[in-house]
C-alpha cells in the first residue's frame, strides 16, 4: 500500500513539473456533502474503512464545477483503480491549480463523522425518552422570551403573542469525548432527528398549532446538553375582565406542559422566575405591566395518581384608554349635552319635544355603531356600557319631563281657569323660585286685577255712585235758582238729569236679577223706538202742572232703558274680569312650568356629571378597593 502511494505521488509530480506556479489547497465548496478524508491522516487506525468511504464519495461528485478538484483529491483512489495510468490534467489557470493541489488538512470530516456516529440508528432512537434509567425523570428546563403582544381579541377572548422559547434537557446518548473528536465542543442537529419533549400550549386557541412554530437546529454540547430554540406565534385563550373596560387591566396566562408525560417521566422546570423582556416591542393598545413565570403541579380528576407539572407565563397588561375616550366617550357626552338645549328652549316655540327626540335618536344610532367594539359577555357589564345606558336613560327622562312641563305650561288654558294649588304657589313659586334665583314679576294688568279682586270688585260701582250723587246735588242747586225766574220753567235737560240720577240710584240700590240676552234686546229695541220718536217730534217735557202725565211716561221708559244699559255694562265688566282672571291663572301656570323646567335642567346637569364621575372616574381611581368592587358587582 505504501509502495502504491509513492508511485502515484511520483507520477503526479512528473506530470505537473512544467507548470510554472505554486500549488495551494482548496477547501470544499459544498459543506453539506462533507466526506470523511481521515484516510489521509495517519493518526486514524481504521484507514482502510475510511478509504473505502472516500472512494465511494469520489465516484459520485456533487457538481461539475468541483469535479476536477474532487478528482485531484481522490487521486489515490483513482490510482488504485488505474495503477498504471497517469491522469492527464487539463489546462487550468494558476490559482485554481494551486488550490486543487493543497489536499492534506484542507477538509476536516470530523464533525460529520461525529454526526453520523451520534445519530447512527443502531445506537440512537429518537422516539425513546433520554434517561440513564427508565425510572428516572428527564429534567427539562423551560425559558420564555416575550417579543410582542400582537392582538387582544375581546370578542373571542384570545391573546396573540409572538414569543421565543428556550427548552433545555440532558441526553446522555448525545455526548462524546472532545479529545477524540478534534476538540469539538458543540454541534447543530436538525430538531426532527432527535428526541424532543412534547411541550405544548395547553390553552391553545388556534387549530393549526404547529403551523405557527418556526424551529431551528438543536444545539448539542459534548456533555449531552441539548438546547432547543424556536419562535412561535401563540394564540391563547384569555378570559377578559370587562368590568373596567376601557380602563381595564388584563391578566392572561400561557400554560405550557407535556401532553404525554407526567412528573415521573418529565420534570418540567424554569430557568428564571421572571420572563425575558429584553427584546420586547411595545404595543399600541396595551402597556405591559409585568410578566412572571410560575411552575405549578396539578392533578387532573381523571388521573388522580399522577402529577403534571405546568409552566404558567402570566402577562399583566394595562389598556391605553386614549383612543376610547376620544372615539367612544367624548361623542356620547356631547350628544347627551344636546339634551340640555331642550330645557332652555322656550315652550312657545313648540320645538322642545322635537329637540329631545332628535337627541334620543342620535344617541341610539351612535350606540348601534359602537356596539361591535364592546366585549360581548354576560359575566359583567363594562363601565362604558353602564355609561351608555345611563346617558340613554337620562335623555329618555328628559323627554318625559319636558312633556310634563309643556302640559303644565298649558294647564291654565286647558283646565278652563283652574287655579294653581296653594301649596304650589307657596313652595314652587315662592321658596323654589327664590332658591333657583328666578324673579317672578307680575305684569301690570294682573297686578291691577289682583287689587280689584281684593276689594271684591267694588271700585267701579262705588265710583259710579259717587259721580251720580255729585250730579244730583248740582241739579238741585240749579233747580232752586231757576225757580226764582218769572216763568218758573226750565229746559228739558234739568229734569232729565234729575230723573237720570234718581233712576240710576234706584237701579243700583235695587237687587234686580240679570235678564237674559233676548229680553234685553227686545226691551232695548222698544225703548229705542220711543226715544227716537221723542227726539224727531221735538217733544221736550217741561216741569209744569199740565205735563205730569207725559213726564211720568218718559220717566218710566227712560228708567227702563237705564237699567238695560247698566246691566250690559255689568255683564261686560264681568266678562273682562273673567278673561283677566284666566290670564292671571295661565300666567301662574306658565311661571310654575318655568320654575319646574329650571329645576329639571339643574337635575339633568347634576345627573350627567354624577354619572361621569361615578362610572368613569371613581372606579378607575379606586379599582383596587374592595368596597368599590362590591359596589360595581351589585350591577
UniProtKB/Swiss-Prot annotation:
Pfam families for the chain: Neur_chan_LBD, Neur_chan_memb
PROSITE patterns assigned: NEUROTR_ION_CHANNEL
Recorded GO CC terms: neuron projection; plasma membrane; postsynaptic membrane; synapse; transmembrane transporter complex
Subcellular location: Postsynaptic cell membrane; Cell membrane
Segments traversing the membrane: 325-345, 355-375, 381-401, 600-620
Extracellular topological intervals: 25-324
Membrane topology value: Multi-pass membrane protein
Keywords, sorted A to Z: Cell membrane, Disulfide bond, Glycoprotein, Ion channel, Ion transport, Ligand-gated ion channel, Membrane, Postsynaptic cell membrane, Receptor, Signal, Synapse, Transmembrane, Transmembrane helix, Transport
This protein's record includes keyword Cell membrane: yes
A Gene Ontology BP annotation from the UniProt entry: regulation of membrane potential
SS bond partners: 238-252
Family per similarity comment: Belongs to the ligand-gated ion channel (TC 1.A.9) family.
Name of the protein in its database record: Ligand-gated ion channel 4
Organism of origin: Caenorhabditis elegans
Amino acid at each position: 500500500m505504501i509502495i502504491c502511494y509513492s508511485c502515484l505521488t511520483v507520477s503526479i509530480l512528473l506530470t505537473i513539473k512544467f507548470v510554472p506556479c505554486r500549488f495551494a489547497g482548496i477547501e470544499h465548496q459544498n459543506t453539506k456533502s462533507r466526506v470523511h478524508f481521515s484516510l489521509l491522516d495517519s493518526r486514524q487506525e481504521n484507514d482502510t474503512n475510511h478509504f473505502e468511504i472516500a472512494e465511494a464519495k469520489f465516484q459520485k461528485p456533487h457538481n461539475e464545477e468541483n469535479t476536477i478538484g474532487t478528482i485531484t483529491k481522490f487521486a489515490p483512489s483513482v490510482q488504485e483503480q488505474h495503477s498504471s495510468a497517469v491522469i492527464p490534467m487539463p489546462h487550468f489557470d494558476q490559482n485554481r491549480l494551486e488550490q486543487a493541489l493543497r489536499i492534506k488538512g484542507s477538509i476536516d470530516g470530523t464533525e460529520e463523522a461525529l454526526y453520523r456516529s451520534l445519530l447512527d440508528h443502531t445506537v440512537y432512537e429518537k422516539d425513546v425518552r433520554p434517561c440513564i434509567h427508565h425510572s428516572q425523570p428527564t429534567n427539562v428546563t423551560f425559558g420564555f422570551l416575550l417579543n410582542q403582544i400582537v392582538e387582544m381579541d375581546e370578542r373571542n377572548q384570545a391573546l396573540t403573542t409572538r414569543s421565543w422559547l428556550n427548552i433545555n434537557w440532558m441526553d446522555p446518548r448525545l455526548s462524546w469525548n472532545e479529545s477524540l473528536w478534534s476538540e469539538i465542543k458543540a454541534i447543530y442537529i436538525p430538531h426532527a432527528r432527535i428526541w424532543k419533549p412534547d411541550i405544548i400550549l395547553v390553552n391553545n386557541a388556534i387549530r393549526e398549532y404547529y403551523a405557527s412554530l418556526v424551529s431551528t437546529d438543536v444545539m448539542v454540547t459534548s456533555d449531552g446538553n441539548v438546547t432547543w430554540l424556536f419562535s412561535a406565534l401563540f394564540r391563547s385563550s384569555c378570559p377578559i375582565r370587562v368590568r373596567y373596560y376601557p380602563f381595564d387591566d388584563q391578566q392572561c396566562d400561557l400554560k405550557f406542559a407535556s401532553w404525554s408525560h407526567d412528573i415521573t417521566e418529565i420534570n418540567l422546570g424554569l430557568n428564571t422566575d421572571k420572563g425575558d423582556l429584553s427584546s420586547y416591542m411595545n404595543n399600541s393598545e396595551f402597556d405591559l405591566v409585568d410578566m412572571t413565570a410560575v411552575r405549578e403541579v396539578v392533578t387532573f380528576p381523571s388521573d388522580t395518581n399522577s402529577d403534571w407539572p405546568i409552566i404558567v407565563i402570566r402577562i399583566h397588561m394595562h389598556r391605553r384608554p386614549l383612543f376610547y375616550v376620544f372615539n367612544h366617550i367624548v361623542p356620547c357626552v356631547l350628544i347627551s349635552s344636546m339634551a340640555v338645549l331642550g330645557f332652555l328652549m322656550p315652550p312657545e316655540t313648540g320645538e322642545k319635544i322635537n329637540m329631545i327626540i332628535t337627541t334620543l335618536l342620535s344617541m341610539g344610532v351612535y350606540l348601534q355603531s359602537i356596539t361591535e367594539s364592546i366585549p360581548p359577555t354576560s359575566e359583567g357589564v363594562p363601565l362604558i356600557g353602564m355609561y351608555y345606558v345611563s346617558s340613554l336613560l337620562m335623555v329618555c327622562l328628559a323627554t318625559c319631563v319636558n312633556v310634563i312641563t309643556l302640559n303644565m305650561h298649558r294647564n291654565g288654558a286647558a283646565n278652563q281657569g283652574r287655579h294653581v294649588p296653594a301649596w304650589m304657589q307657596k313652595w314652587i313659586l315662592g321658596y323654589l323660585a327664590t332658591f333657583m334665583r328666578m324673579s317672578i314679576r307680575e305684569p301690570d294688568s294682573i297686578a291691577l286685577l289682583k287689587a280689584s279682586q281684593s276689594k271684591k270688585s267694588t271700585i267701579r260701582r262705588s265710583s259710579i255712585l259717587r259721580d251720580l250723587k255729585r250730579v244730583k246735588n248740582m241739579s238741585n242747586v240749579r233747580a232752586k235758582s231757576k225757580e226764582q225766574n218769572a216763568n218758573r220753567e226750565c229746559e228739558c235737560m234739568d229734569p232729565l238729569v234729575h230723573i237720570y240720577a234718581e233712576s240710576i240710584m234706584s237701579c243700583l240700590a235695587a237687587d234686580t236679577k240679570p235678564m237674559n240676552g233676548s229680553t234685553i234686546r227686545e226691551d232695548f229695541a222698544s225703548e229705542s223706538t220711543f226715544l227716537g220718536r221723542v227726539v224727531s217730534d221735538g217733544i221736550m217735557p217741561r216741569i209744569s202742572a199740565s205735563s205730569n202725565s207725559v213726564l211720568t211716561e218718559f220717566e218710566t221708559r227712560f228708567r227702563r232703558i237705564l237699567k238695560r244699559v247698566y246691566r250690559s255694562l255689568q255683564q261686560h265688566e264681568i266678562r273682562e274680569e273673567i278673561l283677566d282672571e284666566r290670564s292671571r291663572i295661565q300666567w301662574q301656570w306658565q311661571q310654575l312650568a318655568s320654575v319646574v323646567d329650571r329645576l329639571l335642567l339643574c337635575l339633568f346637569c347634576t345627573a350627567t356629571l354624577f354619572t361621569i364621575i361615578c362610572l368613569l372616574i371613581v372606579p378607575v381611581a379606586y379599582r383596587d378597593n374592595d368596597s368599590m368592587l362590591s359596589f360595581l358587582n351589585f350591577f
